[in-house]
């Protein structure tokens, strides 16, 4: 499949991806190449999903885990026939079989290869596991343990990118399969920002050193990557709060100390970034991102909104920057 053509679009529905085409094209061009099949640790073989794209990066990483004659696999790619061929060849060459299929979440670039696995290995029909399973799948509970020779894998429910998102800890390596919550390059799109940030805090609490992401290279300092991702989001929150405080102060200075300083998202973006922004970037990217941050801050009790003449306007609550 040609780079840039494949990939399951997993992004906030409010966000129009056209605003990011140039950035995504540039990012994809600089990605390091990954081997189709690579033994990345004594217990882990990475098999690329053969679906490179702007959202899937080099392709979906699927992981065969264990050292014995029966192993488990995490994620199944997008349903590309070449991936199924790689899996079949890898199992044949290694003289081992699969006993469990663990799915990180429902997105098609992670579950699309399940029919191919069942075609190749019908006995797996009772061994497919996912949080919030379909009829042919088994449930995964938070803390559930899966064991094969050489590997103990513990499930961690970590929603945010999606409500059913699971990560998996490989106990023997103090490593975590991070799914789409933390990627090998860049940052992930999320369904719910507050939930995702809480999930990252939870992931960090397990003190795993290494991360095996669903897209991109191995993360050698998982703790540092998570810390950096959270710090970036907190910086953006503070930028939004600072801008709201600025608007509030200006309004009160002009109104004798009265006023909430409520503004629309469009007005807030202008306060933060000026009025000379490209219209597409503003409307298709910055405004949806800013509103997502505002919703998270509202859940935290730091901002609120009011409806004036049918228009939603946001304002800071108290001294939110303290």
Swiss-Prot record:
Residues noted as binding Zn(2+) 2 in the record, renumbered to the chain: 109-110
Biological-process GO terms, alphabetical: secondary metabolite biosynthetic process
Catalysed reaction, written as an equation: atrochrysone carboxyl-[ACP] + H2O = atrochrysone carboxylate + holo-[ACP] + H(+)
EC number annotated for this UniProt entry: 3.1.2.-
Record-linked InterPro entries: LACTB2-like_MBL-fold, Metallo-B-lactamas, RibonucZ/Hydroxyglut_hydro, Sec-metab_biosynth-thioest, WH-like_DNA-bd_sf
Pathway: Secondary metabolite biosynthesis
Enzyme class: hydrolase
Ranges in a coiled coil: none
Listed CDD domains: LACTB2-like_MBL-fold
Active site (UniProt): 109
Chain positions recorded as Zn(2+) 1 binding sites: 105, 107
SUPFAM superfamilies, A to Z: Metallo-hydrolase/oxidoreductase
Cofactor: Zn(2+)
Protein family (similarity comment): Belongs to the metallo-beta-lactamase superfamily.
Function as written in the Swiss-Prot or TrEMBL entry: Atrochrysone carboxyl ACP thioesterase; part of the gene cluster that mediates the biosynthesis of the dimeric xanthones cryptosporioptides. The pathway begins with the synthesis of atrochrysone thioester by the polyketide synthase dmx-nrPKS. The atrochrysone carboxyl ACP thioesterase dmxR1 then breaks the thioester bond and releases the atrochrysone carboxylic acid from dmx-nrPKS. Atrochrysone carboxylic acid is decarboxylated by the decarboxylase dmxR15, and oxidized by the anthrone oxygenase dmxR16 to yield emodin. Emodin is then reduced to emodin hydroquinone by the oxidoreductase dmxR7.
This protein's name: Atrochrysone carboxyl ACP thioesterase dmxR1
């Amino acid at each position: 499949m040609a780079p840039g053509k494949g990939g399951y679009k997993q992004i906030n529905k409010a966000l129009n991806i056209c605003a990011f085409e140039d950035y995504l094209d540039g990012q994809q061009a600089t990605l390091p190449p990954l081997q189709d099949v690579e033994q990345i640790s004594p217990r882990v073989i990475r098999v690329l999903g053969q679906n490179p794209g702007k959202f899937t990066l080099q392709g979906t990483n699927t992981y065969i885990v264990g050292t014995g004659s029966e192993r488990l696999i995490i994620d199944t790619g997008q349903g590309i026939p070449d991936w199924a061929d790689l899996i079949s060849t890898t199992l044949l060459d290694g003289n081992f079989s699969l006993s469990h299929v663990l799915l990180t979440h429902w997105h098609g670039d992670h579950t699309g290869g399940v029919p191919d696995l069942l075609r190749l290995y019908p006995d797996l029909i009772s061994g497919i596991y996912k949080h919030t399973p379909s009829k042919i799948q088994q449930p995964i509970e938070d803390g559930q343990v899966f064991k094969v020779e050489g590997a103990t894998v513990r499930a961690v429910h970590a929603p945010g990118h999606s409500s059913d998102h699971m990560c998996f800890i490989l106990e023997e390596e103090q490593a975590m399969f991070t799914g789409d919550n933390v990627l090998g390059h860049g940052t992930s799109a999320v369904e719910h920002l507050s939930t995702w940030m809480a999930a990252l805090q939870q992931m960090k609490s397990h003190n795993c050193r290494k991360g095996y992401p669903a897209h991109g290279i191995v993360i050698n300092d998982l703790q540092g990557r998570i810390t950096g991702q959270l710090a970036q989001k907190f910086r953006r929150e503070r930028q939004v709060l600072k801008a709201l405080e600025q608007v509030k102060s200006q309004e009160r200075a002009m109104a004798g100390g009265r006023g909430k300083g409520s503004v629309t998202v469009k007005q807030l973006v202008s306060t933060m970034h000026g009025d000379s922004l490209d219209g597409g970037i503003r409307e298709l990217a910055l405004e949806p991102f800013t509103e997502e941050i505002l919703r998270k801050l509202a859940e935290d009790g730091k901002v609120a909104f009011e409806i004036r003449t049918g228009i939603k306007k946001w304002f800071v609550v108290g001294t939110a920057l303290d």
